């Protein structure tokens, strides 16, 4: 993507989400015909095709070569804006844990049909696709600090909708549409953070660290949510998640007000 990587990232990333939806519905239809025991073989075929297709992609001009000595990440991670952002990411994903781990079972316990549950998940992905396609508009008119704050506040509202309107499909639908902000917009901001603060040789490890913080947040949150799920109710767990995510606002102050023009 070269110098346009931040600007074009969302438009390219949306196709991953499109592929997810197509894959889910296609594989679901295929499993109506073949036994589920064939699923590993089916996934292996798909992965093999993707692997073979990858060889058709040409190496871009000016692509970074391998480094003999890796540039240290610690100096970058110590920057206030970077440390604050990854802390916010952990808190955000910690609050997502009940959703990623228990949302489907939560809805099933409330007598939502499998079709309704599948539709709600699909709407979440559709909302992120829309965000990936049009997020550059937000970056033109709003500061990075403001956008992260909006992501946190709307995520809190999302979990409140899940809890308060737990028995209502329309309430869950609105909550899923907010996935555009709680995941979509925040993810794009994360990529801009990496492009802006990490050198070309560091960006792969920067994205790996981003994924690590993502996994840690969900993992720790899932452990606690799982422990208290039977002690409390699903509604109470999501209300707690709505409060927890707001702690991320304590770290927004250290984020820059603007993203450098080179990454906008």
Where are these regions (language model features)?
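Intracellular juxtamembrane helix-capping segments at the cytosolic ends
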Residues: 1-3, 185-198
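Loop-to-transmembrane helix entry/capping segments in MFS-fold secondary transporters
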Residues: 3-15, 114, 198-210
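A membrane-interface helix-boundary motif in multi-pass transporters
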Residues: 29-45, 227-245
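Helix-to-loop junctions at the C-terminal end of transmembrane segments
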Residues: 31-32, 131-143, 229-230
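Juxtamembrane intracellular "pre-TM" segments in multi-pass secondary transporters
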Residues: 57-89
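Helix-loop boundary and gating motifs at the non-cytosolic
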Residues: 81-120
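Structural signature of the two symmetry-related core transmembrane helices
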Residues: 146-161
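Helix-loop junctions at membrane interfaces in 12-TM secondary transporters
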Residues: 163-175
